[in-house]
Amino acid sequence: RGKRPHSHRRVLLDRPRLLLPSEFTNACAFCADRYFDTPPEKSRLVKGLDSKFHIIEGLPAASMHDMVAEFRRIPNLFEIVSYDYWHENHNHYPTESQNRRMADYLASAEGYDHVLHVVKMRLEASGENHLETIPDDALLQYANGLFAGGHDVIVARRHYVDGATRTDQNASAGTLSVAEHRAYIGYTIAALKDLYNLNPAVKYVTAFQNWLKPAGASFDHLHKQLVAVDEYGVQIEAEAARVAANPAIYRQILHYVGHRQMMILGNDYAVGFADFGHRYQTIAVWPLGPALLPWEYTREQVDGISDVLHALHCAVGPAVPTNEEWYHRPVDLDVPMRFRILLKQRTSTLAGFEGSTRIYLNSVDPWTLRDEMVELLE
């Protein structure tokens, strides 16, 4: 279906309007003026006087605005796999350090009020009525999930680009500076590794980024999500079986990509190419060298991977809805699965043919996608 006109790929977003000054920091719940509408942060990434990025942990509620957070790691208020699930199925409780963090946070008036506010927000969203009649002690029973859950969000500082004047000038991954994007990727990898320590039953931690509402984002504010799960999932199980049966499969795929001229860009540490076999037009970012876990790469290698991904985000642009999906080897699987990232453009709609046949059409072939991306990168 590669000759279908491209007009169907235009995504209709809300008509832009002029920005109000307050909207730079108050456009959605992820913005800086609304820190107290999200759960207590686990950590933040700040830029120091040395121009380097530093992780700050354990900030009390009263200090939330004392320093600029370039990125924040916060629990997801509406978890995919909830704290209660981990507690009931895997005897999960907060660790000693998490209990101390919770006690310290609740010890201040600002922290106490923040936690109660967030708990009430979640209960209200789930249909709970008459919250004013529920005593604080009962509400605080829900606080464990805000400090010891396994679904985190990595939120960027900006909602709109610096100097924006219209509501369609969102700050995307491609509008970050090279240094900011490198920090974003490194910070996400550190959180990914940390979530494997949530509970012995964690089998996999999935990482992804939904950009814009047509791609599944709750807010048009740049963020990644990480979710600890107690199973590998169909994709990982199937890939592990293929790799075990054919350890050379990744090399063969890269050879095929090169032979069929699907490569888009690369550096010493990673390549990006037009991928195939997906429901949406997809670009793959593959690190080069041995198959490693994401946190086993050196800082230089991570930066190289980040640069390839960042260039692709820049080329795609902030107006295109995308899903960024991370794949890696589960820590307890002894199969040489490769870390890689897929960038899927959500500009087509699955319709009646796909639903009735389970045959999925992609109207953009890999070579058209390659040519488009190369032109945009130039």
Stretch-by-stretch model annotation:
Residues R1-E378:
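HIT superfamily nucleotide-processing domains
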